[in-house]
């Protein structure tokens, strides 16, 4: 039985959506069990223990307000979930708690893969090409970025794209303000030259507006810029949905026309719905550590659990270790 440790505390809406997604997930995946970590009384409002659902009492919520170093030593649901992976009682951990606390605790407990300098947050974005995904990293784990980080992230993400997303010889690019070699900061230019000489299928710089074109499989970016890209994309998709809804309900004729276009609108919204992904990998650690959004709903949590399942089934950490040796 494969096991996922799921910290269901610290999100925006309580444990209900996380628990319900877990129940749906184990029903579809009889070879998996989930350990729900959190306030047992709250969790038991929505489920009892079963052969596939276990509950670990750990009601305290991790917060970076307590100090990042200090929070990693405290008793909270996040640390309890991470400890299950460290103690080999779980194959992976998922949490939607405080990002800073999660990254720090995971670094101190799970540790980095041998030779990896810094982990990165890596979501899997949908693109405008049907069934085509792109890996984008780092989206906020590191405010300062060195050339070596970008090189290592490119290598790890290429392996991930190949083994998890089944992309043959993934195309990689560095996100920059332009595609010309002379543009960007010094670390952009140096990393660009080094990646040209590497074994990666590197195509050069990529502008942010082209990330969702579907022509690239891996987009590597500094953590500050990546976080801006992530939040801008989420906001743009939500704004677009709102504008379309307002526009098609303005007149009676548009409402009638919208009925005929309903399936097309639904397909487009589904293709760009980030909830189908639901999470970002903490890439570069010596274990499967996945971070979901604090505002996740049922659908987003289900997408996150599916991501974790893919990583476990592909034995992605073993693949990383073998490749990095």
UniProtKB/Swiss-Prot annotation:
One of the GO biological process terms: fatty acid biosynthetic process
Main localization (coarse): cytoplasm
Q: Does the keyword Lipid biosynthesis apply?
A: yes
Q: In which pathway does it act?
A: Lipid metabolism; phospholipid metabolism
Q: What class of enzyme is it?
A: transferase
Q: Which residues form the signal peptide?
A: none
Any Pfam family the entry gives: FA_synthesis
PANTHER family named among the record's database cross-references = FATTY ACID/PHOSPHOLIPID SYNTHESIS PROTEIN PLSX (PTHR30100), PHOSPHATE ACYLTRANSFERASE (PTHR30100:SF1)
The record's subunit annotation is: Homodimer. Probably interacts with PlsY.
- Output this protein's name: Phosphate acyltransferase
Q: Which organism is it from?
A: Mycoplasmopsis pulmonis (strain UAB CTIP) (Mycoplasma pulmonis)
Q: What is the lineage of its organism?
A: Bacteria, Bacillati, Mycoplasmatota, Mycoplasmoidales, Metamycoplasmataceae
Name of the encoding gene: plsX
């Amino acid at each position: 039985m494969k096991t996922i440790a799921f910290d269901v505390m610290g999100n925006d809406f309580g444990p209900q959506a996380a628990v319900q997604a877990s129940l749906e997930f184990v029903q579809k995946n009889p070879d998996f069990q989930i350990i729900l970590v959190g306030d047992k009384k709250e969790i038991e409002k929505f489920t009892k223990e079963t052969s596939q659902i276990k509950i670990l009492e750990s009601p305290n919520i991790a917060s970076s307000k307590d100090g990042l170093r200090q929070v990693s030593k405290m008793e909270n649901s996040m640390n309890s979930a991470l400890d299950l992976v460290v103690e080999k009682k779980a194959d992976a951990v998922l949490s939607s708690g405080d990002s800073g606390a999660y990254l720090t605790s995971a670094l101190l407990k799970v540790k980095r893969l041998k030779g990896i300098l810094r982990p990165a947050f890596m979501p899997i974005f949908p693109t405008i090409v049907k069934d085509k995904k792109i890996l984008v990293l780092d989206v906020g784990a590191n405010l300062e970025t060195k050339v070596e980080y970008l090189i290592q992230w490119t290598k790890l993400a290429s392996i991930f794209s190949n083994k998890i997303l089944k992309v043959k010889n993934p195309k990689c690019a560095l996100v920059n303000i332009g595609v010309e070699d002379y543009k960007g900061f010094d670390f952009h230019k140096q990393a660009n030259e080094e990646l040209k000489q590497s074994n990666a299928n590197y195509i050069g710089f990529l502008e942010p507006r082209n990330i969702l074109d579907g022509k690239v499989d891996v987009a590597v970016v500094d953590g500050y810029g990546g976080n801006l890209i992530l939040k801008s994309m989420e906001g743009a998709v939500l704004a677009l949905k709102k504008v379309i809804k307002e526009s098609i309900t303005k007149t009676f004729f548009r409402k009638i026309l919208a009925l005929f276009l309903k399936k097309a609108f639904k397909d487009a919204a589904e293709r760009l719905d980030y909830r189908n992904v639901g999470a970002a990998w903490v890439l570069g650690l010596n274990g499967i550590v996945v971070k979901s959004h604090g505002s996740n709903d049922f659908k987003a949590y289900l997408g996150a659990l599916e991501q974790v399942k893919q990583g476990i089934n592909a034995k992605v950490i073993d693949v990383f270790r073998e490749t990095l040796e």
